[in-house]
A protein has these predicted regions:
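Short, acidic/small-residue loops that bind anionic groups at enzyme active sites
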Residues: 56-73, 77, 103-104
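Generic hydrophobic alpha-helical segments
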Residues: 21-29, 67, 109, 189
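Short Gly/Thr/Asp-enriched flexible loops that form oxyanion-binding sites at enzyme active sites
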Residues: 45-64, 88-89
């Protein structure tokens, strides 16, 4: 069954607003007896799946699933950017391998992959980078590897999803004035949380605070006076609360 999907899909895949664009294919998969649905963006470098029950598989779990399949066959490092799900780290360590984080952006991910000799990497927006093919996000490669995993394990899409830890990512933004010194604010956030025993601070791209069971990542925009706040936890409510907590911290620092 052919599907014509609007070019705005990559942005919707990134930010989770699926209903407006993907409702049609989700309903078709759920009622049409399909094993899965496949969604790509116009330049075919981002990839998301629809489960056989019509639910979103989760674009963050595209890379996680493919990495799990690769690590079943070849042991090695994995890489994703700082704003991607912690599930990749969990799966990588489950295979006895090492996970590395890079700054956001495909070039930063591939640079880190080459540096550590990663066997698989990518971004949580559904971007899969498989060095055996080439150093670039490629949805077709991701599709082939994902289907191979389903076939090898003999499971449905929803059954495969249940084998991975579940996290939820909340995405917020802080609107600031053009004269706000965002670098100074990020420095204050790093200083404030850096002395805490249960927080790991990473500052290669904004400031990311890793807590034992959750994280929050603050990044400034290079084109407008806003700061993006991504946070992840075991529930969406907890993830959003963590993001809002850091937003309050930043707003307080601007007074």
């Amino acid at each position: 069954h052919e599907r014509t999907l609007p070019f705005e899909i990559p942005h919707e895949i990134c930010y989770g607003k699926f209903g407006r664009y993907l409702g049609g294919i989700m309903g078709e998969v759920a009622t049409g007896g399909y094993d899965l649905g496949i969604v790509v963006d116009p330049d075919v470098d981002r990839l998301a799946f629809i489960q056989e029950d019509g639910k979103m598989y989760g674009e963050e779990y595209t890379l996680v699933s493919v990495a799990d399949y690769i690590l079943d066959h070849v042991k090695g490092a994995t890489v994703s950017n700082l704003s991607s799900t912690r599930a990749l780290r969990d799966v990588t360590e489950r295979h006895g391998c090492q996970y590395f984080a890079s700054a956001v952006g495909e070039v930063n991910v591939t640079t880190k992959m080459k540096e550590v000799g990663a066997v698989i990497g990518g971004e949580g927006n559904g971007g899969v980078i498989y060095p055996e093919s080439h150093y670039g996000r490629d949805a077709l490669v991701g599709i082939a590897l994902f289907l191979s995993s389903l076939a090898q394990k003999g499971v449905t899409c929803s059954e495969l999803r249940k084998t991975f830890p579940t996290y939820y990512i909340a995405k917020n933004r802080i609107d600031l004035t053009p004269d706000t010194d965002m670098d100074a604010i990020l420095g204050k956030v790093k200083e404030r949380f850096g002395s805490m025993d249960d927080v790991q601070v990473t500052d290669i791209d904004g400031v990311k605070l890793d807590f034992p069971t959750k994280w929050v990542h603050l990044r400034k925009s290079n084109t407008e006076p806003i700061m993006r706040v991504y946070s992840e936890a075991a529930t969406m409510e907890e993830a959003d609360a963590l993001g809002k907590e850091l937003m309050d911290v930043v707003y307080e620092m601007t007074k």
